[in-house]
Design a protein with these regions (language model features):
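Beta-rich carbohydrate-recognition and catalytic domains
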Residues: 1-153, 158-189
């Protein structure tokens, strides 16, 4: 099934647009199991529900011209949860566990002074269809000397050292920086 609907004024048909709303922050991922590309994105409904917005949706493609919608993969949390609103993330496949891991930014709704405005969270899937959030994992910047409110957009890769690296955009002492977290198992950083 193709869900492609071009909005290109020159009718080139070069990009995907969902039937409802807009694509925000595409997160491309080559799926080594399926042999195709998955493009996860923040689904922007406009207007979005108050406080909870940007669930992660996805499409798959083999040629970047025809797309199959995979629908919603990772839902927003409740207003009380750290991921009431979801921000950009990154996906990686772990050959050892045969699991997909998507790390994303959890944006707290109306954070108090004691809350973290942003934190890194993750969900896993064995089939790229059904995702389970790891509710016990919340990586907080202030636990490592970084900002508790500017801690976002994780990017994951497996380094030449054989370890997983997660780069996080953040601030430290009022200056922008990229934090590099390292893990052997994608669970302990």
């Amino acid at each position: 099934t193709s869900y492609f609907s071009s909005t290109d004024e020159t009718a080139q048909g070069t990009y995907y647009k969902p039937a409802v709303g807009y694509v925000g922050d595409p997160m491309p991922f080559y799926d080594p199991v399926a042999g195709d590309f998955k493009i996860m994105y923040l689904q922007d409904f406009r207007p979005n529900p108050a406080g909870t917005y940007h669930p992660i949706w996805a499409v798959s493609t083999k040629d970047a011209a025809n797309y199959e919608s995979l629908g919603e993969l990772i839902s927003c949390g409740t207003l009380q949860e750290q991921d009431a609103a979801i921000g950009t993330g990154s996906t990686i496949y772990d050959e050892n566990s045969k699991l997909y891991y998507t790390f994303y930014t959890g944006n707290k709704y109306n954070p108090t002074a004691s809350d973290n405005g942003q934190a890194i969270m993750y969900a896993t899937s064995s089939d790229f269809k059904t995702w389970t959030k790891c509710k016990s994992f919340i990586l907080k910047g202030d636990d490592y000397g970084y900002s508790k409110n500017d801690f976002r957009d994780p990017f994951l890769f497996k380094g030449d050292d054989g370890k997983y690296h997660m780069l996080v955009a953040t601030t430290k002492n009022g200056k922008g920086t990229i934090a590099d977290f390292i893990s052997d198992d994608l669970k302990s950083w």
